């Protein structure tokens, strides 16, 4: 294609536009007039309607004037404010919001394809909530299993240490038969050491063979830790394997509902192990509503604790003693 252009009344300048082979061969697309419907897969359609920044469906679409890429209004404005003033897709320079223009036609197209946009977003939120809940259950059960393993290792090391101490004590007693002065001196040294060992064992709230203990990480850095003695209710709990005294050390920010949920998951896990099952469905159904937490008052009565109370608040309101707080648990009547 050739074209001559006259400039300034002098000699004409010729411009030549060379067409590619594709441009020479292409023909206009025929309009569909017979009601033909073209099927498009939702996945390919969603990729066209997706914001490259948040990877969700476009909302309040904004189009760049230079490269014509589309983004959500909030996403692209935030990217320009905190980024390098460039298109997130092609890295073309965008000076400011003046390089963007709203695209109401594309928003209208999305509303035609998805007339129930609110229902779609509500469904997405429900799916995400279900996934997060499942992941939290798995993390909790994994934390309990790891805690049990660590406690078993500590128990084994304590047993070996006691055997070594007992053996060394027997050797000291054998040597004392030959020298009374040496035995008196050794007994004076061994007495305080044994006393210190016993004191540390009593104050450590460590795990027995029949009792279960669980150390829960603090919810927030710097939060005070509270030691609990978790006993079965003396009248509302049946005498079975699950009715054990449990020792817990956790954050003061933890609530009573957290304790109830931990207890439900812990007992469900112990039941699975006792039956030799590997099905984790019981853990998914564990709820904080299965167990009610009580505290004994000065009058000997048991007071039901509100599930939203933090353990620090319970300690300040009911306990007020500088020793591990004693709580009691029993199945909720509705879940018996």
Swiss-Prot record:
Modified residues (N-acetylserine): 2
Keywords tagged on the record: Acetylation, Chromosome, Cytoplasm, Disease variant, Epilepsy, Intellectual disability, Isopeptide bond, Metal-binding, Nucleus, Phosphoprotein, Repressor, Transcription, Transcription regulation, Transferase, Ubl conjugation, Ubl conjugation pathway, Zinc, Zinc-finger
Gene (UniProt): RNF2
Cross-link (Glycyl lysine isopeptide (Lys-Gly) (interchain with G-Cter in ubiquitin)): 112
Protein name in UniProt: E3 ubiquitin-protein ligase RING2
Organism: Homo sapiens (Human)
Annotated zinc fingers (RING-type), start-end: 51-91
SUPFAM superfamilies: RING/U-box
Top EC group: transferase
One Pfam short name: RAWUL
Keyword Repressor: yes
InterPro entries assigned to the protein according to its UniProt record, in alphabetical order: RAWUL, RING1/RING2, RING2_RAWUL_dom, Znf_RING, Znf_RING/FYVE/PHD, Znf_RING_CS
């Amino acid at each position: 294609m050739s074209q001559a252009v006259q400039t300034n009344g002098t000699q004409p300048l010729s411009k030549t536009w060379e067409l590619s082979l594709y441009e020479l061969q292409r023909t206009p697309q025929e309009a569909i007039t017979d009601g033909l419907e073209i099927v498009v897969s939702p996945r390919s359609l969603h990729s066209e309607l997706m914001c490259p920044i948040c990877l969700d469906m476009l909302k309040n679409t904004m189009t760049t004037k230079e490269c014509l890429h589309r983004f959500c209004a909030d996403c692209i404005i935030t990217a320009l404010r905190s980024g390098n003033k460039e298109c997130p897709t092609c890295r073309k320079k965008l000076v400011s919001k003046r390089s963007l223009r709203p695209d109401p036609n594309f928003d209208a197209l999305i509303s035609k394809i998805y007339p129930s946009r609110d229902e779609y977003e509500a469904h997405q939120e429900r799916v995400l909530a279900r996934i997060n809940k499942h992941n939290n259950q798995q993390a909790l059960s994994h934390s309990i299993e790891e805690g049990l393993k660590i406690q078993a290792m500590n128990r084994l090391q304590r047993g070996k240490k006691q055997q070594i101490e007992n053996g060394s004590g027997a050797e000291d007693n054998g040597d004392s038969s030959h020298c009374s002065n040496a035995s008196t001196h050794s007994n004076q040294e061994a007495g305080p050491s044994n006393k210190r060992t016993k004191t540390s064992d009593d104050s450590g709230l460590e795990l027995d063979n029949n009792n279960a203990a669980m150390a829960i990480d603090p919810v927030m850095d710097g939060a005070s830790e509270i030691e609990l003695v978790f006993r079965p209710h003396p009248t509302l709990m049946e005498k079975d394997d699950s009715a054990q005294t449990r020792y817990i050390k956790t954050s003061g920010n933890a609530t009573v509902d957290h304790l109830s949920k931990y207890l439900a998951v812990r007992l469900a896990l112990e039941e699975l192990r006792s039956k030799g099952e590997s099905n984790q469905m019981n853990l998914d159904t564990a709820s904080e509503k299965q167990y009610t937490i009580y505290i004994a008052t000065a009058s000997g009565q048991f007071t039901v604790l509100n599930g939203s109370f933090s353990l620090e608040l319970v300690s300040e309101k009911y306990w007020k003693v500088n020793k591990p707080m004693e709580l009691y648990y029993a199945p909720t009547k509705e879940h018996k």
